[in-house]
Amino acid sequence: MNVGFLGFGAMGRALAEGLVHAGALQAAQVYACALNQEKLRAQCTSLGIGACASVQELVQKSEWIFLAVKPSQISTVLRDRQSFQGKVLISLAAGMSCAAYEALFAADPHQGIRHLSLLPNLPCQVARGVIIAEARHTLHHDEHAALLAVLRTVAQVEVVDTAYFAIAGVIAGCAPAFAAQFIEALADAGVRYGLARDQAYRLAAHMLEGTAALIQHSGVHPAQLKDRVCSPAGSTIRGVLALEEQGLRRAVIHAVRAALSSS
C-alpha cells in the first residue's frame, strides 16, 4: 500500500517522518507533492521518499492520500474528482469535518471517495504525538482499523464525536505552541538567575516531559500532583500563588478560546 501527502508543510512532513522512522511505513511506500518543487525534492531526499511533480502523479501512485494543505486549498486540489475515485482521503485540515467533505462531494455522490478527518500535532514527528480522529467517517471498517493502527505507532489516537472535534484539536494541535511558550518562559527565568540558555531549555523541557509522563502513568490528578510538590510555606506554593495572581489559568482558557474561534 502506497501513501501520498498532498501538501508537505510542517504538519505533513512531521507525520510522514514519524511514520517512516517508526517503521509503520517504508520510505518506498511514501510520496509527497507540494507547490515548491525545489524545497519538496530536498525534503523528500532527506527522508528517502518519492517527490511527485503533480497532484495527478501523486494520486496515481497512492491508495491513501493525506490532505495536508490549508482548508482554503481543499476544493482546488480536489477539483478533478474523477482522479480520486476509489481512494481513501485523510484530511489534516482544521475546520474540515466529515460533513464538510460530504457537502463538497455532494454533486458527485457515486465516485467512491472515502474520507476521514484528523487533527494531528507536531510531536508525531518523534512518535510522541496526539491525533484527534473524528468518529464520523466514510471508510470501510477494515480501512479504518488499519489506518488507526498505523497512526498509533506515532501518536495517542483519540476518536471524538464531531461536536468535540474542534476543541479536542485545539488542545492537541495548538497547545504544543502554548507548552513551548511555557518552556521558553521558564528558561528565560533560569537565564535571569544565572543558568546557561541551553541548560535552562533542557531542564524545562525534561521537567514538562516527566510531569506529563507521571500524570499519564500514575493517573494522579494534576491538582493532587501540584499539592504533592507544595510543602507548607515552601518555595513552590509561593510560585503557584504568583501564577494564580498573574492569571495563568485565565490566560490559558482565553488562549484556547481564541484558537477555537478561528477553527
Curated annotation (Swiss-Prot):
Protein's UniProt keywords contain Isomerase: no
Pathway in which this enzyme or protein is active: Amino-acid biosynthesis; L-proline biosynthesis; L-proline from L-glutamate 5-semialdehyde: step 1/1
DNA-binding in keyword set: no
Enzyme Commission numbers on file: 1.5.1.2
Alphabetical UniProt keywords: Amino-acid biosynthesis, Cytoplasm, NADP, Oxidoreductase, Proline biosynthesis
Coiled-coil positions: none
An individual GO BP term: L-proline biosynthetic process
GO cellular component terms, semicolon-separated: cytoplasm
PANTHER family, A to Z: PYRROLINE-5-CARBOXYLATE REDUCTASE, PYRROLINE-5-CARBOXYLATE REDUCTASE 3
Function as written in the Swiss-Prot or TrEMBL entry: Catalyzes the reduction of 1-pyrroline-5-carboxylate (PCA) to L-proline.
Protein name: Pyrroline-5-carboxylate reductase
Organism: Treponema pallidum (strain Nichols)
Gene: proC
